[in-house]
Regions:
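Structural scaffold elements adjacent to functional motifs in cytosolic proteins
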Residues: 6-8
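Periplasmic peptidoglycan-binding/tethering modules of Gram-negative envelope proteins
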Residues: 1
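Rhodanese-like catalytic fold shared by cysteine-dependent sulfurtransferases
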Residues: 4, 16-44, 51-104
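Histidine/lysine/aspartate-rich catalytic loop segments that bind and position anionic ligands
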Residues: 12
Length: 104
């Protein structure tokens, strides 16, 4: 299977507070050739941010694509990650998500 890495496109304080397990953090405004030179270009990066109302993941996906990386965007961000019942890490990390059930 293809290797996938979650990429938190928010500022560091958001990542530090709570993030997807094993995610890396590069704020979208700081994505440059220099700040991404250590990344593996063969990996698929999935950008995310806070969720609805935040566009850091969209901007991050655009920046990473322009830098030559394979990218997808996690629609709904970390909030929908938690709504789907997944755990988070960080200062406010939770072992399980909210298990919110929607009709979609």
């Amino acid at each position: 299977g293809e290797k996938v890495i979650a990429l938190d496109a928010r500022k560091y304080f958001g990542y530090e507070a709570e993030h997807i397990p094993s995610a890396i953090n590069i704020p979208h405004r700081e994505m440059t050739i220099e700040s991404t030179k250590h990344l593996d270009a063969t990996v698929l990066y999935v950008t995310y941010c806070d969720g609805i109302g935040c566009n850091a993941s969209t901007k991050g996906a655009l920046n990473m694509t322009r830098l030559g990386f394979k990218v997808k965007e996690l629609i709904g961000g970390i909030e929908w990650w938690k709504f789907d019942g997944y755990a988070t890490e960080g200062i406010n990390g939770k072992q399980t998500g909210l298990k919110f059930e929607c009709a979609c």
